[in-house]
Amino acid sequence: MDSNTVSSFQVDCFLWHVRKRFADQELGDAPFLDRLRRDQKSLRGRGSTLGLDIETATRAGKQIVERILEEESDEALKMTIASVPASRYLTDMTLEEMSRDWFMLMPKQKVAGSLCIRMDQAIMDKNIILKANFSVIFDRLETLILLRAFTEEGAIVGEISPLPSLPGHTDEDVKNAIGVLIGGLEWNDNTVRVSETLQRFAWRSSNEDGRPPLPPNQKRKMARTIESEV
């Protein structure tokens, strides 16, 4: 096993522990708490994949961080912070919408790269909107936290979420996954639109009807993908 992989996991475990202590003092805002929960799932998945104990890794990560801080001067810290581009966290969904449990009458699941796509194939003839919480850097989608499909009545009928065991995805991965979800929902004569915020930062455009600019051949391909897996 690569030593950098192990040490990276150890540092991530310790930093999560620090953030958890911060949250326990009721100091974290909604985006902070949301990332904390999702990073916990990711660490559990990575720990299982690597065969490493999280508690032991946290202690080792603490030693690594302490060693770095002992060697770090205040001036070097200022320069590092100034050179790192800041990302923004954007929210279409409330914390309640993100954390709400939902159930599918006819469940369908597909894995696309490091993203998991889920939808209820029992939903028909509905108006559906896709909402997402994600981070943005350089005015482009950086990391998807969670995307969910809602009916006009507020019911959740679909979802795209990162796989905890496979961290890392691009904006193209997200757009492709959205295409799969749209294709599956439209196959049952649902009308799907994407939130203006998601259109703006994923496709850098905004259509009045809420339709992302998916090429016609891609939409046909997505519909066939869903159909073939039913």
UniProtKB/Swiss-Prot annotation:
Cysteines joined through disulfide linkages: none
SUPFAM superfamilies, alphabetized: Ns1 effector domain-like (SSF143021), S15/NS1 RNA-binding domain (SSF47060)
Motif Nuclear localization signal positions after renumbering to this chain: 34-38
UniProt source species: Influenza A virus (strain A/Blue-winged teal/Minnesota/993/1980 H6N6)
Location in the cell: Host nucleus; Host cytoplasm
Chain residue ranges for the region called Disordered: 205-230
Location, primary (coarse class): host cell
UniProt function note: Inhibits post-transcriptional processing of cellular pre-mRNA, by binding and inhibiting two cellular proteins that are required for the 3'-end processing of cellular pre-mRNAs: the 30 kDa cleavage and polyadenylation specificity factor/CPSF4 and the poly(A)-binding protein 2/PABPN1. In turn, unprocessed 3' end pre-mRNAs accumulate in the host nucleus and are no longer exported to the cytoplasm. Cellular protein synthesis is thereby shut off very early after virus infection.
Gene3D superfamilies: Influenza virus non-structural protein, effector domain (3.30.420.330), S15/NS1, RNA-binding (1.10.287.10)
InterPro entries documented for this protein: NS1, NS1A, NS1A_effect_dom-like_sf, uS15_NS1_RNA-bd_sf
CPSF4-binding: annotated span: 180-215
Oligomeric and partner information: Forms homodimers and higher-order oligomers. Interacts with host TRIM25 (via coiled coil); this interaction specifically inhibits TRIM25 multimerization and TRIM25-mediated RIGI CARD ubiquitination. Interacts with human EIF2AK2/PKR, CPSF4, IVNS1ABP and PABPN1. Interacts with human DLG1 (via PDZ domains 1 and 2) and human SCRIB; the interaction results in the translocation of DLG1 and SCRIB from the cell membrane to perinuclear puncta. Interacts indirectly with human LIN7C via its interaction with DLG1, the interaction facilitates translocation of LIN7C to cytoplasmic puncta.
Similarity comment: family membership: Belongs to the influenza A viruses NS1 family.
GO terms, molecular function: protein serine/threonine kinase inhibitor activity; RNA binding
Protein's UniProt keywords contain RNA-binding: yes
Effect of W187Y: No effect on oligomerization
Name of the featured protein: Non-structural protein 1
GO CC annotation terms, alphabetical: host cell cytoplasm; host cell nucleus
Taxonomic lineage from the root: Viruses, Riboviria, Orthornavirae, Negarnaviricota, Polyploviricotina
Region described as RNA-binding and homodimerization: 1-73
Region annotation PABPN1-binding: where it falls in the sequence: 223-230
